[in-house]
Amino acid sequence: MTQTWPFLHNAQSFIQENWNASGFQKPTPVQEQAAQLIMDGKDVIAESPTGTGKTLAYALPVLERIKPEQKHPQAVILAPSRELVMQIFQVIQDWKAGSELRAASLIGGANVKKQVEKLKKHPHIIVGTPGRVFELIKAKKLKMHEVKTIVLDETDQLVLPEHRETMKQIIKTTLRDRQLLCFSATLKKETEDVLRELAQEPEVLKVQRSKAEAGKVKHQYLICDQRDKVKLLQKLSRLEGMQALVFVRDIGNLSVYAEKLAYHHVELGVLHSEAKKMERAKIIATFEDGEFPLLLATDIAARGLDIENLPYVIHADIPDEDGYVHRSGRTGRAGKEGNVLSLVTKLEESKLKKMAKKLGVELSEAVYAGGKLKTK
């Protein structure tokens, strides 16, 4: 494959070796399309579904462009949550193996003094949450004048009011000729408008999941009364091989579902945005080990969550279009098989069908009978 993907063919040996060791056969469409644009120094705004390899799409060219002999930060990657920052940081750590490049993670809630010590080791790449990165810039601990590239991961979240001004301030601390790379699973028009103001003549990439990949994720819905959704979740939890990330609308609903399911002796984990970092990590690790079938979460709590080979996503409460894309993208990642189940009332059925049609999702009705899930 190194011969047919120009970027990889021309990349430094450590990138080629790590690629060969990864077992990847070929780049995903977003990786292939973004690499050359980034190498050419262009600003990029990219939309590509969750699970299509967006992190590597920018990480590999960013690693390729770093000059190890220069001792200052050359790339800053911003992400909206601590979990996502740590995931991206791990990707950078894995793919810089065999090189002299150094990276540091800067997240809120962690010890500032330790982070300042990290910066004294002259990392080439910074991965961080906007609040903590800006705090260290203001404290003159993080120097931005030599930063050549800024990456905004999950851009749709970074332009929300709670992050937008901080993100803009961080970008303003760099020189005008810096490169801006924006990657997101969904790209609303207002998000794109904000980014166009910040970027310089950006190339806009909109990559769809291939038909073959999309076909590996089965989208189904089950009809029940609102009051029976807990009972249905209880039944689904007993399906063979059931391991599902169950999305609910808000923290109030989360508590209601969790209490009722626990009352019926359903083993589950609960992720809410107020959970402590260690507590979250423990719940996620236990779920990944298959200790319980259902992990309940709100959209905010699940930000940056990446569970490998997750077989099911369940929408206990119906989201909007962007929410459906983000949530459903947690299963069937990197071309693997997956299942998306929506629990809907008769009234919600038409809303779901309209949404599926707009998103180009093939949807079928299913029923739970005889301990199995059957297509109606």
UniProtKB/Swiss-Prot annotation:
Gene3D superfamilies: P-loop containing nucleotide triphosphate hydrolases
Single annotated GO MF: RNA strand annealing activity
Induction conditions: In rich medium highest expression in exponential growth, expression decreases in stationary phase (at protein level).
Domain of life the protein comes from: Bacteria
Binding site for ATP: S48, P49, T50, G51, T52, G53, K54, T55
GO CC terms, sorted: cytosol
Family to which the UniProt record says this protein belongs: Belongs to the DEAD box helicase family.
Full protein name: Probable ATP-dependent RNA helicase YfmL
Organism, as annotated: Bacillus subtilis (strain 168)
